[in-house]
């Protein structure tokens, strides 16, 4: 499976509940940042994956963190962005 395919697999998995958001964020960040050849992505994928990457890198499951304005993203925000990115594919 290519890195691109792995990213889509993770997105589909977090949306359907196969992955917890924390695990999704860790894996998406690692694969996108270190294993993905961005030249192989479509323009829509580049934009969507980059936006999602910026969010997963700042995911927190702690309420205290989430109270800091414009710093961290919640589970709900990550899932909403994943669904938005998924909609770009179809």
What are these regions (language model features)?
Residues 1-90:
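Acidic, Ser/Pro/Thr-rich low-complexity regulatory regions
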């Amino acid at each position: 499976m290519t890195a691109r395919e792995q990213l889509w697999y993770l997105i589909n998995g977090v949306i359907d509940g196969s992955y917890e958001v924390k695990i999704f964020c860790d894996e998406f960040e690692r694969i996108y940042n270190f294993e993905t050849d961005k030249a192989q992505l479509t323009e829509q994928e580049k934009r969507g994956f980059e936006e999602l990457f910026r969010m997963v890198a700042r995911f927190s499951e702690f309420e205290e963190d989430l109270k800091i304005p414009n710093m961290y993203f919640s589970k709900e925000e990550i899932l909403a962005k994943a669904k938005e990115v998924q909609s770009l594919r179809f």
